[in-house]
């Protein structure tokens, strides 16, 4: 698909259609027709037009980004998370089996005495709500997050619980704790930040001698293969070559690592931790229409993945521009947008009869100080 960028370039250079027509020796009506797609310029004119604007022909045709300047992902910023409470609520609903967390606490980490827990990047405190009732009585939970809205939400969720909890509004990177903790933990944090290894080392500093550091992270490759929808082609759902380029671009440009889950055990060793190991979260969501909680879980899966509505042409072009800026070529970006819209359409048309399997592929890595 060609996305002719003439109008965008003309407006960026503060030119009227009349002025651009005079430069190119055509009428303003011709410029208007080119911009609205009624007609197209002769191929021989493309080098002249692109040279005038100082861009490549591929960029003029929308086959390459107009700007070389990389636009960083904002997922490691407080602003990004201020209004994503609903997203966290929906994703956490299908993230854990309670009995597996109980197995980790009692049989793997062998926690038998009351402990203090620091949850780094706690969000609304989902991990504490799951874990704290499984810990010995007298344990304390401390959650820290750089989103004020998330901290306020956490306080509301814990207000009427029996959990001894405290919440701190602060950036982990600049946090200076008054004490160290028996257990320092994070969930789905390191994949979102720049330089996750550095943040992990920072977390290790918060751990008491003899204490435990735990990181729970999705490996994005696992996650990209972790969805099957009956009636859709599984191989098509797994196709993500363009995403691999995006992951590589973000790693090169801002040191955001979508594969960090695989590397964390080795980062823990470099940070001086001992008896390091890793496990896989055993949660796999299998959804069938007959399930009593079918609508609830389907709704959460749809909203967690932003599959509520098909994207408009304008939204698709905005997304394509972003994806191309992050390493995809235009075809890969178009294919990915088409894939997402295809999922939305299928789920909407078959809402009453969806069968699916979904897993995040979360790796749980841990080591003692």
Map each language-model feature to its residues.
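A short, Lys/Arg-rich alpha-helix, primarily the initiator
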Residues: 1-12
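DNA major-groove recognition helix of helix-turn-helix/homeodomain DNA-binding modules
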Residues: 44-59
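Conserved class I S-adenosyl-L-methionine
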Residues: 66-115, 126-130, 134, 150
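Class I SAM-dependent methyltransferase SAM/SAH-binding core
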Residues: 118-120, 124-174
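A short acidic, Gly/Pro-enriched loop at the edge of an enzyme's catalytic core
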Residues: 176-184
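A short glycine-rich, Lys/Arg-flanked "PGG" loop and its adjoining helix->strand segment in the class I
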Residues: 198-212
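Conserved catalytic/acceptor-binding region of the Class I
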Residues: 219-307
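Conserved Class I S-adenosyl-L-methionine
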Residues: 258, 262, 277-368
């Amino acid at each position: 698909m060609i996305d002719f960028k003439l109008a965008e370039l003309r407006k960026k250079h503060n030119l009227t259609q009349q002025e651009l027509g005079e430069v190119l020796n055509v009428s303003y009506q011709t410029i208007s027709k080119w911009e609205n797609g009624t007609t197209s310029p002769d191929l021989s004119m493309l080098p002249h037009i692109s040279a005038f604007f100082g861009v490549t022909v591929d960029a003029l045709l929308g086959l390459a980004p107009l700007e070389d300047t990389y636009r960083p992902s904002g997922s490691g910023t407080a602003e990004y998370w201020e209004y994503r409470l609903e997203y966290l609520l929906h994703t956490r609903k299908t993230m854990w089996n309670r009995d597996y967390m109980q197995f980790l606490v009692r049989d793997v980490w062998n926690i038998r005495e009351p402990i203090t827990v620091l949850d780094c990047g706690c969000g609304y405190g989902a991990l504490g709500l799951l874990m704290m009732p499984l810990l010995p009585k007298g344990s304390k939970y401390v959650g820290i997050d750089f989103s004020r809205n998330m901290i306020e939400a956490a306080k509301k969720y814990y207000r009427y619980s029996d959990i001894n909890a405290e919440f701190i509004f602060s950036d982990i990177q600049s946090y200076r704790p008054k004490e160290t903790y028996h257990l320092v933990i994070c969930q789905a944090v390191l994949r979102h930040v720049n330089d996750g290894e550095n943040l992990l080392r920072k977390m290790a500093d918060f751990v008491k001698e003899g204490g435990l550091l735990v990181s729970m992270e999705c490996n994005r490759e696992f996650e990209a293969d972790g969805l099957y929808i009956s009636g859709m082609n599984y191989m098509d759902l797994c196709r993500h070559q363009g995403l691999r380029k995006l992951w590589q671009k973000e790693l090169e440009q801002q040191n955001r690592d979508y594969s960090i889950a695989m590397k964390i055990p080795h980062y823990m060793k470099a940070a001086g931790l001992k008896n390091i190991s890793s496990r896989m979260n055993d949660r796999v969501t299998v959804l069938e229409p007959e399930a009593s909680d079918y609508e609830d879980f389907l709704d959460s899966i749809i909203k967690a993945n932003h599959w509520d509505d098909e994207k408009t042409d304008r939204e698709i072009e905005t997304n394509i521009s972003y994806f191309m800026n992050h390493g995809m070529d235009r075809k890969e970006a178009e294919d990915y947008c088409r894939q997402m819209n295809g999922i939305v359409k299928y789920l909407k048309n078959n809402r009453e009869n969806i069968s699916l399997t979904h897993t995040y592929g979360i790796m749980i890595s841990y080591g003692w100080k």
